[in-house]
Amino acid sequence: MKVTSRALGEVLYVYLEGEIDECSVNCVRREVDESIENHAMAQKVIVNLANVSFMDSTGIGFLIGRYKKIQRYGMSMYIESPNFTADKVLAVSGIYTLIPKL
């Protein structure tokens, strides 16, 4: 799993690539949390899932956990460009009612 992040103005973009599953989630969580903490002045966090090749319920839990953390900082969170497979998992879970898709 690869995590890349960059801040542009008041927006923190987080790009995830690979599989979000039980084996990778702890490393991904640490990297994303560190990026959020380093950019605590951002107003929005946009998580790009275009290159996520696999995601199960562990990925949903990961996103909800990041959403809660981001809320504590007073930021908004959005999901961007989920691929077809990730989009199906997220839509069925109902997560888009909590974290809007761009």
Predicted regions and their residues:
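Absolute protein N-terminus
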Residues: 1-2, 102
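Short leucine-rich amphipathic alpha-helices used at interfaces
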Residues: 2-3, 37
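STAS-typified acidic loop motif
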Residues: 4-30
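Amphipathic alpha-helical interaction surfaces in cytosolic regulatory modules
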Residues: 22-98
